[in-house]
Each structure stands twice: as C-alpha cells, then as structure tokens.
C-alpha cells in the first residue's frame, strides 16, 4: 500500500515537473515573439487630406533615421481624410498612434475624450505646429475671370470650389481667411456677413475634404477658382505647370496644422517611444526642408528664409488668435447653428 502511494506521489511530481517545464518553454517562446514584434514597430499616422505626398516622403526618411539610430525596423501606416472626419474616427476607435491634423481644434476634440493628455500643445515646439501654410486661390491658366482678390469671388458668374467646414479643417481656414478680408474691407459686421453670404452663394461644389475639392477642380474641371491650402496649390502647379496658376490674395490667414500623440493608444500599443520620435523628427532640419519643398512653411525661421523665393513672406496674415482662439472661433462660426450655418441656409 505504501509502495503504491509512493508511486502515485512520484507520478504527480513528474506531471507537475513536465507541466512546469512546458510553461517555461511557452513563456520563453512568447517572450521571443514579443521581441520580434518590437523589432518591427508599426505606428499609424492619422492625418488630413493634402499631407499624403509629404508624409510618403517623410516616412521614408524617418524609417531610415530610426533604423540608423536604434537599429530597428519601423513601419508607418498612413490614414488621410477631412481633418474633422479623421478626428472623429479616432474618437470612435481608430487606432492612431499620432494625429497630424489641420487645426488645433480637431485635436482638442480628441483631448476632451481623454485619449490625449491635457497640455499636448506644449509637448513640441511652436505649439506643436511643425509647419504652417496659408490660404490662396488656384485658377486655370490665363485666369479668364480676372480673379485677383477676395472681392472677385463674389462676382456674378464666378464658380468657387471650397470644401465643407463641417468635415474639413482646411475649409475652416478658408472661411476665416475670407472673413479676415471682410473685416479689413467693410468694418461693419452686417456687411462682413453679407460678403460671406455672397461668396458661399457662388460655391458650386462643396466636398468633404481639401483633396476632394482639388480633385473636383483639377480632374473634374469644375469651377473657376479653388480656395486652397498654399501647399496644395503649389503641388498642383508643379504637376500641371501649363494648366494652373496661383493667385495670392491681399489678405490671408496663418494656417497652423497641429500634431500630437494619442496617449491612450500609444500606451496600449506600446509605441510611445517610436511615436514621440516620429513627431520630434518633424522639427529636424531635413524634415523642415522637405516640408518646404512640398509647399509647407517650415516653423524653423532660418530654414523658412532659405525658401523666401517660394513663399510670399510679406503679406498680411490673420492669426487664429485674432478670432479669439479655436475654442471661441469654432463655437461662433462652425458649430451647428453658428454663423456658417446661417450663411449657408440663407442661400
């Protein structure tokens, strides 16, 4: 009886040792898999419409930089669309590690959900705006409608193309640039709003994003003038030098696209280090020069001056602070029932 019990005990001990050995092998195997995943880090950049070409080139530079510095291979997935729509996609569960959106307000909407930490604007230089732009007009070669300034956009028979401020960050900048001109010209709120009403009465197609509006104007041949990001207009003229030209209005606005980590996502994904490096590298000299070559205005003033032949650095530019900052401006002009809705529903 004792011998039988002893054998049973030995069998149980043997089973436990086998089970323990199996668990240890499994843990080592899983650790090995984890290391492999770390060797091929993947992040997703949720961005707005016209940045596609810039980030395609930037990502290649960054991947090389990260490999040279850390010896690790990185993959960057790009996602593009209207800035407001992209912000909502992150709020609704899109697994972006970083957001590079058209305006601060879109990132603040994500911040309000707790996905992005408060104070994100101060995480990187220049209020987390590594590059800027402004708003210009793109017309067909020859400029048959003689469009020279904002006042020409309200003429009878002029068809204007601009995206929808409800989904496009660029469209919000377009609206505010036009409003800046109206403020300087009329000095009367009623007349300013009448000007904006006439302008939007001339809008024939209103796409959901800036790239969609460019496609409508360039590929579908709709409209006489496109209100556009300066960088988008520069790229279009570069691609079609004999078909389009840029008109710089007398007054525009300093458009500041913003960038941020999506803090909750990078924590879950284990990508905080790579995502932080990704955004920091936007401020490197190489990335700043690339931004300039792609039509964006570098935040580095020294590098910006090197491209002064490409950009008009002496024109009057309104700033978002002139409209009370984004929180105030969005409530006043773009929320449901605000000024844009009143203007657009009066048509």
Protein language model annotation of sequence segments:
Residues 3-20:
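Bacterial N-terminal signal peptides that target proteins for export
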């Amino acid at each position: 009886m004792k011998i039988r019990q002893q054998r049973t005990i030995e069998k149980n001990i043997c089973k436990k040792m086998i089970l323990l050995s199996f668990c240890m092998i499994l843990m080592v195997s899983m650790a090995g898999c984890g290391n492999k995943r770390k060797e091929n880090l993947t992040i997703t950049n949720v961005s707005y419409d016209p940045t596609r070409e810039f980030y395609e080139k930037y990502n290649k530079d960054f991947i090389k930089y990260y490999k040279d510095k850390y010896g690790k291979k990185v993959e960057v997935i790009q996602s593009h669309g209207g800035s407001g729509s992209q912000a909502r996609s992150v709020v609704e569960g899109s697994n972006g590690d970083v957001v590079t959106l058209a305006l601060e307000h879109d990132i603040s909407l994500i911040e309000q959900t707790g996905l992005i930490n408060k104070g994100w604007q101060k995480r990187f230089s220049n209020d987390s705006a590594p590059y800027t732009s402004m708003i210009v007009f793109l017309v067909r070669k020859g400029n048959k409608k003689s469009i020279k300034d904002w006042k020409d956009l309200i003429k009878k028979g002029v068809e204007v193309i601009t995206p929808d401020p409800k989904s496009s960050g660029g469209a919000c900048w377009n609206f505010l640039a036009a409003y800046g001109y109206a403020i300087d010209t009329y000095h009367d709120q009623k007349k300013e709003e009448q000007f904006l009403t006439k302008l939007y009465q001339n809008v024939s197609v209103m796409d959901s994003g800036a790239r969609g509006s460019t496609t409508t104007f360039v590929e579908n041949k709709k409209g006489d003038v496109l209100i556009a990001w300066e960088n988008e207009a520069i790229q279009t003229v570069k691609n079609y030098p004999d078909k389009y030209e840029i008109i710089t209005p007398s007054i525009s606005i300093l458009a500041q696209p913003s960038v941020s980590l999506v803090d909750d996502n990078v924590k879950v994904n284990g990508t905080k280090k790579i995502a932080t490096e990704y955004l920091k590298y936007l401020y490197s000299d190489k990335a700043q020069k690339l931004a300039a070559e792609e039509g964006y205005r570098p935040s580095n003033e020294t590098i910006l001056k090197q491209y002064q032949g490409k950009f008009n650095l002496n024109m009057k530019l309104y700033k978002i602070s002139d409209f009370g900052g984004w929180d105030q401006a969005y409530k006043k002009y773009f929320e449901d029932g605000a000024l844009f809705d009143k203007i657009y529903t009066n048509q």
